[in-house]
Amino acid sequence: MVTWVLNYLLVAFLFAISYNIDAASAGITRHYQFDIQLKNITRLCKTKTIVTVNGKFPGPRVTAREGDNLQIKVVNHVSNNISIHWHGIRQLRSGWADGPSYVTQCPIRMGQSYVYNFTVTGQRGTLWWHAHIQWMRATVYGPLIILPKLHQPYPFPKPYKQVPILFGEWFNADPQAVVQQALQTGAGPNASDAHTFNGLPGPLYNCSTKDTYKLMVKPGKTYLLRLINAALNDELFFTIANHTLTVVEADACYVKPFQTNIVLLGPGQTTNVLLKTKPIYPNATFYMLARPYFTGQGTIDNTTVAGILQYQHHTKSSKNLSIIKPSLPPINSTSYAANFTKMFRSLASSTFPANVPKVVDKQYFFAIGLGTNPCPKNQTCQGPTNTTKFAASINNVSFILPNKTSLLQSYFVGKSKNVFMTDFPTAPIIPFNYTGTPPNNTMVSRGTKVVVLKYKTTVELVLQGTSILGIEAHPIHLHGFNFYVVGQGFGNFNPARDPKHYNLVDPVERNTINIPSGGWVAIRFLADNPGVWLMHCHIEIHLSWGLTMAWVVLDGDLPNQKLLPPPSDFPKC
């Protein structure tokens, strides 16, 4: 009898453990509501009305665990159309929830709502969410934190505390008016008036000392800083005076840890760093600074945002402490940018393998850069000349979004003929010396063109920067996938030489990669996610000018390899 009871208890115990493991693995459903509403905000002594989520700027933090299902209801109370992109989420078979307007959905109109329903599969780390229509993401953005599954440790020392820090840009003017003026005149856009940490410009701007982000820390602790570059148009250097940072993650993918004093993030990128505080209380406070990296032509916001790292003390006041200020690289320090980027390597461990495709089915070569459109008749423009407007393109195709339906919807119902074409060029139609003397003709062609891929195609894509209207870096973001960065360099990509030096062992895995200024980058990915997926420069004005394209990934043969149908509350155009 005793033996039977013990056996029964043992079986029950093992069943409970198994059930808990399965439950932890399966995840839970988490519900959020985003109310899109107007809010008066004062920065730099100027009060203006901005579009927010739930009246917060930046917006609320979304937290989940790997394996969780997220159902986020977005209710639009403002006259602006809106859609939300969950930047970096794979959206496996849930492309209807990806968010870019007129790509995977029509925007949510005033008085309408839409539930973004997706499951976080095989991902953990720092991501973010933002509006994906016009320049609405200037104020509509926030962190998306994916914690590991229960009882799964980090592959680095457990931090005492985790702190998201979002980099942003503040415009005294309405960002929508800024981009509309630029597109109408053909000129570059007016620059922002400040950079921000978590919405605060800090003490280096006029009338801004009270709006300073402070990070309060204790001595002898390790903090995980979740850095997110949500700026519209600026790549940013970041540093903390007298403190070394250990990089442990990029774009929600763990990396081999390395130490640095300065972090560079392009728009759209995230980087997790460990900050180990000093062992005893220092008689000082420390500036955190961020300012742009830029090599292109035109006007940018070359100002510096400052926050304060302050040590807590139960008796001492910080009022009379000196503030130590760090230094940052010059604005055009491409050498630092390149060396920093090369430091990133995947863990490539048994727990977190680097599944880089070794065999490639399809190869593509995309020339990325600026260009021009002709000025409309009887109008004087302010582009490179008074007869041209600024534009941008991939393989000389400047992308035009549809406005009466979405690419995904037209594809799903089999009515894409009058919406997009499938003849996107796999390489430049007219090759040229991409990083040398630019061609005399800088005019781009315009169209809505995509590349079609069969399910599970392995893709190698070389992204080549160009010198047309100036060389500059381009942070390229791919929706729906992560990719491996197998190679990068300066000058023109050499197909006979450069692939021999690819890293196919531990290349970094990302969703957004900087094409070096005057250089190239090679990526590989597996097209295992059916749907329509945007790929674009995350410098917002370049996206507005057409530096984007889309991949259509066809369904596979099995039921779990097919795109699910759209939800019942899917927004209508």
Curated annotation (Swiss-Prot):
Coiled coil: none
Binding site for Cu cation 3: H132, H479, H536
Signal peptide (from-to): 1-26
Molecular-function annotations in GO: copper ion binding; hydroquinone:oxygen oxidoreductase activity
Binding residues annotated for Cu cation 4, in chain numbering: H474, C537, H542
Amino-acid positions noted as binding Cu cation 1 in the UniProt annotation, renumbered to this chain: H85, H477
Assigned EC number: 1.10.3.2
One Pfam family this sequence matches: Cu-oxidase_2
Compartments reported by the entry: Secreted, Extracellular space, Apoplast
GO CC terms in record: apoplast
Lineage: superkingdom: Eukaryota
Main function: Lignin degradation and detoxification of lignin-derived products. Required for root elongation in dehydration conditions.
PANTHER family: LACCASE-2 (PTHR11709:SF256), MULTI-COPPER OXIDASE (PTHR11709)
Protein name from the UniProt record: Laccase-2
Gene that this polypeptide is encoded by: LAC2
